Amino acid sequence: MLNDVISEYEAHLKKATEALRHHLASIRTGRASSALVEHLHVEAYGMTMPLNQLANISVPEPRLIVIQPYDANMIKAIEKAIQQSDLGLNPSNDGRVIRLPVPPLTEERRRELVKMVRHRVEEVKISVRNQRRDAIDDLKKLEAEKLISEDELHRGQERIQQLTDRCTRELDQIGAEKEAEVMAV
């Protein structure tokens, strides 16, 4: 019982950490990365599909993303999806491939991105705290139903707090690394 609650809580922490990593990977820094565009949704064949299913995405230079659609008829739809995204990138095409130059970020834009990173990290920390509260409530219910002892309840609460502290440190580190990446000129 106790281990089930703790295992479930650990799984939530892993999901939250991975979700943060995934979200931060899509935030543009001054360097080109396929992660910036691979999950853009493109209207294709009567439905919405992620770009990485419609094209080969490569980064031949530090400030250039090259997108080679599997179907040349998709170039306009892919360009439209890029222009409608909030990336602020201007695609150009030669009929076969789309070139996406990634300009260096202005100081003002870097500061905005750092704020976005901090905000997202804080949102995930709030989610972690809410999960902690739910896990502790689950333990208290088990104790009230006499399925675990009071000592087990306290051990469980301590373990959950240790996991929360470790996860919070990891989230802070992920955020700090992304901030440093954004601020690097």
Curated annotation (Swiss-Prot):
SUPFAM superfamilies documented for this protein: Ribosome recycling factor, RRF
Gene3D superfamilies, A to Z: 3.30.1360.40, Ribosome-recycling factor (1.10.132.20)
Source organism, top-level taxon: Bacteria
Keywords noted in UniProt: Cytoplasm, Protein biosynthesis
CC terms in the record's Gene Ontology section: cytoplasm
GO molecular function, one term: ribosomal large subunit binding
Location of this chain's protein in the cell: Cytoplasm
Family: Belongs to the RRF family.
Function comment: Responsible for the release of ribosomes from messenger RNA at the termination of protein biosynthesis. May increase the efficiency of translation by recycling ribosomes from one round of translation to another.
Name recorded for this polypeptide: Ribosome-recycling factor
Lineage: Bacteria, Bacillati, Chloroflexota, Chloroflexia, Chloroflexales
